Amino acid sequence: MTSPLTPSASEGRWTPRLWGTLLVLCAAMFLDALDVSMVGVALPSIGADLGLSTSSLQWVVSGYILGYGGLLLLGGRAADLLGRRQVFLVALGVFALASLLGGLVDSGPLLIASRFIKGLSAAFTAPAGLSIITTTFPQGPLRNRALSIYTTCAATGFSMGLVLSGLLTEASWRLTMLLPAPIALVALIAGLKLLPRSARERDHNGYDIPGAVLGTASMLLLVFTVVQAPEAGWTSARTLLSFLAIAVLLTVFVMVERRSPGPLIRLGVLRSGTQIRAQLGAMTFFGSYVGFQFLVTLYMQSLLGWSALHTALAFLPAGALVALSSTSVGSIVDRFGTQRLLAAGFALMVVGYALFLGIDLDPAYAAAILPSMLLIGAACALVFPSLNIQATDGVDDREQGMVSGLLNTSVQVGGAIFLAVVTAVVTAGAPADPTPQAVLDSYRPGLIVVTGIAVAGLLIALSGLRRTTGAQQTVVVARSDTRSVVKETATGTEAETERVPVRD
């Protein structure tokens, strides 16, 4: 299902141009993750230099999350309608300019604005980049390998961001903001030459402006509410009214999408059990990991007294394992299918989190911490590529951006919601007498929640494993004059359908 405007990969082999295309897209994914992790370590220096309060400092992080999570649905559909290459390159250019702005500003509000713009840009590069891969590389071993390399760049970027931030902040926090700019510029120049040209969707049924406004508004409000809830209070009038407004917006959004001839999100996509499992798996995978990283970072820095760089190096084995496995995961998917890898990955994740429950105040890294890091790294290497493959397999080229945006939205919303839940649990159990042991004990309920989220992901994966029982599935894409309907079948037939075999 490749576009006639994409470079030919029908022979099932890698070419220098395909490698160049993938490298550009990986650079953008790497930058997104790098930017998220680098700023966390630099926050104390930023606050001291710009005179920001703790609440204002939070928005240096939350501003990026708000722009990214709130606009992913729009970014994915824009890639389908306006051209994937065009959307990706314009957004990458904006990302580079916002990085430059963030490193040069001398006020908190401008820094927060630059972070929001970077998040907004990433909301367009992420789904556009993923959809370029799924429409350039033919479905099967070639695409699976490309996706496994692409998705592991996120873990690599995140791990390197932690280490680089610890080093750069020693000189100036501004370097952490400026570093992505030259990388983005080089990727932009290379992308102009290497990325395949894609035509705009000519036969779409107009632009879904009401759906875009409602979908973006509901996602922005959801992310904002979840980020603010721990400070405002989960049962406060403001939080409850915000959730009520979100429910109303989403209800109206669904009504609009059902009637729109060219919807922002075609709701029929969500009738596929495989698609539902991919979206829920993305939420539980990222939500559990973000909560784990938050608690472990607090443990290492607040209770063990480790520096930011020491903490980053403690997480490095997990990222290194993901990076080293990047070229082999695709072939494992070809052999065993995504559902088996998801079940195995979530099982490893559950064990890794559970092992950390027994941690104490005097741990031996090799015996107490490293095993969890390696198990979680192996889990990430299996789960994240499999989720991307599962979500995009069998989807029409015209809807790859939409599905990519939906998957990335699930990742971000899951991370925001579950991190807020873990934070609320830990805050509720904060000890009156904050001795180190009492504080450590207050972290354990949060770790139990993290483990429970991973167990939920494992159950979702196992439900798909029972359905497939090792057989090959067929995703049926049925078309009508105005919209498509995607659904899952094992033996049924459909009139006017296109069948795509998927190893689920």
Provide a role label for each language-model segment.
Residues T152, T156-A171, F224, V413-A432:
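A gly/Pro-rich, aromatic-decorated transmembrane alpha-helix motif that marks the paired
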Residues S148, T169-A282, S288, W306, ...:
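Hydrophobic transmembrane-helix bundles of small-molecule transporters
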Residues V163, V186-K193, L221-F224, V252-M255, ...:
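Transmembrane alpha-helix boundary/anchor motif
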Residues M1-R17, G464-D504:
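Intrinsic disorder in cytosolic terminal tails and internal cytosolic loops
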Residues L18-L34, V39-V41, T54, L175, ...:
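12-transmembrane solute porter fold
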Residues T2-K193, T327-V329, F336, A347-V350, ...:
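Transmembrane-helix bundle of Major Facilitator Superfamily
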Residues I132, T136, L194, F224, ...:
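A residue-level signal for alpha-helical anchor/packing sites in multi-pass solute transporters
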